[in-house]
Regions:
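Negatively charged, low-complexity tracts enriched in Asp/Glu with abundant Ser/Thr
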Residues: 1-44
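Short acidic DE-rich linear segments
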Residues: 1-4, 105-112
Length: 112
């Protein structure tokens, strides 16, 4: 069963940003960073970007764009996501830890 929970997302077609209020307890600086990251991605590349947690707590970048959108930069998309994963590694790992602790109820003290 692959249930995902959307953290946030941005849509270049409607020029909108979405933040899941279930995560409202995150620090404002993290929420701001996510907002900037998603909006800049869609401004640079186009399409729709969502950051989603999978059922194991891994944070994934999901990108969608209609096939008829010839302005969507598929190569730029891969490069931009790779850039974010490197530059924002610490923040992304912290978000995964937060999700696994508060949403999945994992006891992280017992990790080996």
């Amino acid at each position: 069963m692959m249930d995902t929970k959307v953290l946030c997302g941005a849509n270049s077609y409607e020029q909108k940003y979405y933040f899941n209020q279930e995560f409202s307890s995150l620090p404002q600086s993290i929420k701001d960073e996510l907002h900037i990251m998603c909006v800049l991605y869609t401004e640079d590349v186009g399409g729709i970007l969502t950051l989603e947690f999978d059922d194991s707590g891994a944070l994934e970048f999901k990108v969608t764009a209609p096939e008829e959108d010839y302005l969507f930069d598929e190569i730029g998309s891969v490069l931009k996501i790779k850039q974010y994963q490197e530059e924002k590694r610490e923040m992304l790992e912290s978000l995964e830890l937060y999700y696994r602790t508060f949403f999945l109820g994992e006891d992280l003290d017992g990790e080996e």
